[in-house]
Swiss-Prot record:
Note: Mycofactocin is classified as a ribosomally synthesized and post-translationally modified peptide (RiPP).
InterPro entries in alphabetical order: MftA
Function summary: Precursor peptide that leads to mycofactocin (MFT) after extensive post-translational modifications by enzymes encoded by adjacent genes. Mycofactocin acts as a redox cofactor of nicotinamide-dependent oxidoreductases encoded in the same locus.
Protein name: Mycofactocin precursor peptide
Spans traversing the lipid bilayer: none
Protein family per UniProt: Belongs to the mycofactocin precursor peptide family.
NCBIfam families linked to this entry: mycofactocin
Lineage, opening ranks: Bacteria, Bacillati, Actinomycetota, Actinomycetes, Mycobacteriales
Site (Cleavage): G27, V28
Modifications after synthesis and translation: The post-translational modifications that lead to mycofactocin involve oxidative decarboxylation of the C-terminal tyrosine residue catalyzed by MftC, introduction of a tyramine-valine cross-link, removal of the modified C-terminal dipeptide by MftE. The released dipeptide then undergoes oxidative deamination by MftD, glycosylation by MftF and methylation by an unknown enzyme.
Length: 29
C-alpha cells in the first residue's frame, strides 16, 4: 500500500511539474 501510494504521488508530482514547466515555457495557457 505505502509503496503504491508513494509511486502514485511521484507520478502525479511529475505530471504537475511537467505541466507547469510547459505552461511557463509556452505562456499560452
Amino acid at each position: 500500500m505505502d509503496y503504491e501510494t508513494d509511486t502514485d504521488t511521484e507520478l502525479v508530482t511529475e505530471t504537475l511539474v511537467e505541466e507547469v514547466s510547459i505552461d511557463g515555457m509556452c505562456g499560452v495557457y
